[in-house]
């Protein structure tokens, strides 16, 4: 919905086209012209939209692209974020909010890429009518299937959804049988990558929960799907999966925490990703084991990636961060532990998976984390980024003293490939007053 010609808000647009006044940010222009069908949507837009807009601007998107992606956010995501304040705890994010923002930096990329992770929510999510929020994700898939989003293909969602979804009986048992199960009610989520003019989508599911509640082995549930996709002639990642499966068994990495991910493209072009959690990465020897799947993935690209990963490990220094400032109701991390999330990416025709490590920053002083990231940027030779980064992050959170906060930077993830070189993503809290 837009402002009508006699609406005083429309004057802002007229002034801009007439060259009067200084040009406001795209978010402000849109806000002056748009209207909202509900107060919830208006609140999500006003609370999170400025940061998304600033991320786009600071990452080098053209003015046209900023308007394009902000409009996408307004039209496609804001209406699907549910009540404000949030009433459903999403297990996709550390904050429990239905979305998180991140920026990806690539050694061989043109400019940073802004991303959003989101779980669509509505007012019934978490209630007895839809306790595990299964309906809004399905509706979002159906919507994008009809919306003409370039390259969007729902086939893998249609394949995995019936295999990874909890039944109502399993949903009823989960809070009692899984630690923290009362907050583990996310079934499906989405990732949005804003690449130039386009938006690409990723999907996430929770086969670990399904296998646990169904009395199955996670390895069999996921592995059977990988093999079946090959047998159907749609996607062959069986060799890479065999390496992941063998290493997860050695690591004892199976459990209710396992996530799964794919791309919303034709299956043959999709990546598959398997996620696990390691409570304590004790040293760089363990780090190397995780990166190479205990010697199973040692290509030249893996070795070069390992070199930079060790540099990042030394700088972040998870083993010596001290006590984290975490909410009382959040899982508490022992001071001497170095927990990490890992995923392993598999693609058709490549027998070697590539790992990605996630360093948790939540509970650590934000200004201190920023300085560590600046140090890594300098080590990589990213001088302009290093010089501007503190100011850039401050622009996301105007009015906050980042030397006194510890919840704005959530994660930094690292991977490497021949195509991208170092591939670093930093995850930010989208609504810090939460």
Swiss-Prot record:
One of its GO terms (biological process) is alkaloid metabolic process. Nonribosomal peptide synthase involved in the synthesis of nidulanin A and derived compounds. Nidulanin A is a tetracyclopeptide with the sequence L-Phe-L-Kyn-L-Val-D-Val and an isoprene unit N-linked to the amino group of L-kynurenine. The NRPS nlsA is responsible of the synthesis of the cyclopeptide and the prenyltransferase nptA adds the isoprene unit on the L-kynurenine residue of nidulanin A. Further modifications lead to additional oxygenated related compounds. The gene is nptA. Disruption phenotype: Accumulates the unprenylated precursor of nidulanin A, but none of the three prenylated forms, including nidulanin A and two oxygenated related compounds. L-tryptophan binds at residues 91-92, 100, 206. The lineage of its organism: Eukaryota, Fungi, Dikarya, Ascomycota, Pezizomycotina. It is an enzyme of class 2 (transferase). It comes from Emericella nidulans (strain FGSC A4 / ATCC 38163 / CBS 112.46 / NRRL 194 / M139). The keyword Transferase applies. Its EC number is 2.5.1.34. This is Tryptophan dimethylallyltransferase nptA. InterPro entries: Aro_prenylTrfase (IPR033964), Aro_prenylTrfase_DMATS (IPR017795), DMATS-type_fun (IPR012148).
């Amino acid at each position: 919905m837009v402002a009508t010609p006699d609406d005083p808000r429309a004057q802002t647009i007229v002034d801009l086209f007439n060259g009067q006044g200084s040009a406001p940010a795209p978010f402000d222009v849109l806000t002056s012209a748009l209207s909202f069908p509900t107060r919830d949507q208006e609140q999500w837009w006003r609370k999170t939209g400025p940061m998304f807009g600033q991320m786009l601007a600071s990452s080098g998107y053209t003015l046209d692209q900023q308007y394009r992606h902000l409009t996408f956010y307004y039209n496609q995501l804001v209406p699907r974020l549910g009540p404000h304040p949030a009433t459903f705890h999403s297990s996709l994010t550390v904050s429990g909010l239905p979305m998180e923002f991140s920026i990806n930096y690539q050694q061989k990329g043109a400019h940073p890429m802004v991303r959003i992770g989101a779980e669509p929510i509505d007012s019934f999510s978490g209630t007895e009518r839809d306790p595990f929020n299964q309906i809004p994700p399905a509706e979002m898939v159906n919507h994008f299937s009809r919306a003409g989003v370039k390259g969007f293909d729902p086939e893998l969602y249609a394949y995995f959804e019936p295999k990874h979804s909890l039944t109502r009986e399993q949903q009823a048992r989960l809070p009692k049988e899984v630690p923290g199960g009362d907050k583990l009610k996310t079934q499906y989520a989405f990732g949005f990558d804003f690449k130039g003019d386009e938006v690409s989508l990723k999907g996430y599911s929770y086969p670990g929960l399904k296998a646990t509640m169904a009395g199955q082995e996670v390895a069999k549930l996921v592995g059977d799907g990988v093999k079946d996709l090959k047998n159907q002639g749609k996607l062959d990642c069986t060799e890479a999966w065999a390496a992941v499966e063998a290493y997860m068994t050695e690591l004892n990495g199976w459990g209710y925490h396992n996530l799964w991910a794919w791309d919303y493209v034709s299956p043959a072009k999709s990546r598959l990703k398997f996620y696990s959690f390691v409570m304590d990465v004790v040293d760089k020897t363990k780090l190397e084991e995780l990166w190479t799947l205990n010697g199973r993935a040692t290509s030249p690209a893996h070795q070069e990636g390992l070199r930079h990963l060790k540099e990042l490990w030394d700088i972040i220094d998870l083993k010596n961060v001290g006590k984290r400032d975490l909410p009382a109701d959040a899982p508490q991390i022992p001071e001497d532990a170095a927990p990490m999330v890992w995923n392993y990416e598999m693609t058709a025709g490549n027998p070697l998976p590539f790992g990605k490590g996630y360093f948790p920053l939540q509970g650590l002083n934000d200004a201190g984390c920023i300085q560590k990231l600046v140090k890594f940027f300098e080590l990589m030779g990213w001088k302009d980024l290093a010089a501007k980064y503190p100011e850039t992050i401050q622009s996301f959170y105007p009015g906050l003293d980042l030397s006194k906060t510890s919840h704005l930077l959530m994660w930094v993830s690292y991977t490497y490939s021949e195509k991208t070189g170092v591939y670093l993503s930093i995850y930010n809290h989208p609504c810090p007053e939460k």
